[in-house]
Amino acid sequence: MTTPPSLPRHARVVIVGGGVIGTSTAYHLALMGWQDIVLLERHQLTAGTTWHAAGLMVTYGSTSETSTEIRKYTRDLYGRLEAETGQATGFMPIGFIEVASDKDRLEEFRRVAAFNRYCGIDVQEISPRQVQELFPLAKVDDIEAGFYVKEDGRVNPVDVTMALGKGARMRGVKILEGVPATGVLQKSGRVTGVRTPYGDIQTDFVVNCAGLWARELGAMSGVAISNQAAEHYYLITEAIKDLPPNMPVLEDPSAYGYYRQEGGGLMVGLFEPVCAPWKIDGTPTDTPYLDLEPDWERMGPYLETAMSRVPVTSQVGMKKFFCGPESFTPDLKPIVGEAPELRGYFVAAGLNSIGILTGGGLGRVMAHWIINGLPDVDVTGMNIDRVLPFQANPEYRRSRTVESLGMVYKCH
């Protein structure tokens, strides 16, 4: 193969993966002053899971100080990126409401709200009547309360990624699309380069942001990464007559659903309690923008339950019932940091469907870690050093993934 003129022979850092995490890491490395950064993307930016993300930008919900800070930073970053880069992010601070539909959820959400307030998130507990005033289409006669964050909302995931990519390019990052990483070179337990079909790039640091493909890329270098793809669903309705403008995002874990406006109708997103792992034996690398055949029989009861919270969704036509692969980990925490098996090999993957709402902050954390040798926040709970080799075996991934997606909406 002829080496493209644009393929450098050396880079200070090579990032593999052009989704929101990869572009954010590139952006923050450049923002902190590092030059000679290269990002490799096998297909096109966003072609893995970022393109089909729902785009929720929510700071409420975590009881981790680190995770809450990362979410808050991400929301603030998305709010200012357009002014910096000229590329829209689609950020709309329309608000977010978490619905407590029983006493147990009420107790849990009050505890979460108190912790989030401590972390600087303005969370208000509101009555069922106030929930309906903000989201008139919701059925509220069986709920206890709502928890409202006015500054939260939604973004366009593709636009966010393009804005981060543009911001990175403006600071000198070289983004190469259509260039896969086929291996990582090493010597004496340390990264020395990245192999591509067009030649090798010498480097001291590799960042695996390959999303769905992170496990396979890690395995090439003996790095254990225990993420696994699973089916993930949302429905988009036909246009709804007299749909109130700028309703907040609504979420009801007891109904397995979240709801936001989409193209004149509503999106109904799902986190079912028992999910379906996808491609246990390996994720296909030759197909970008994966759009899977929905399992109507399995998902029908969950969809029915979710639609009951917003009854109009079952009274209008259905534009699309989308199923796409999303990456989950056994403990529902991201896998980030320097791999214990190989010095200079960093990982940021396994985002468990929160890649958009943590992407900005996680890219910052990775940049600090690479540049300074330490992250700028406590990442103990998500550090890759907790991953054991057996957790990457197929049966373990299958059995744990069946449960892990359902943990998102489980009452804790």
Predicted segment positions?
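Beta1/beta-strand and adjacent pyrophosphate-binding region of the FAD-binding site
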Residues: L7-I21, V38
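Dinucleotide-binding Rossmann-like beta1-alpha1 core, especially the glycine-rich loop
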Residues: G55-L134, S254-Y259, G263-G265, L290
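Glycine-rich FAD pyrophosphate-binding loop
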Residues: A30-W51
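Helical element adjacent to the flavin cofactor pocket in flavoenzyme catalytic cores
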Residues: Y148-F205
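Active-site lid/adjacent beta-loop-alpha segment flanking the redox-cofactor pocket in flavoenzymes
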Residues: V223-A224, A239-G344
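Short beta-strand to alpha-helix junction loop
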Residues: E69, V99-E107, F147-K166, L176, ...
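C-terminal catalytic lobe of FAD-dependent flavoproteins
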Residues: P157, E293-C411
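Central helical "cap/lid" subdomain
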Residues: G199-N246, V377
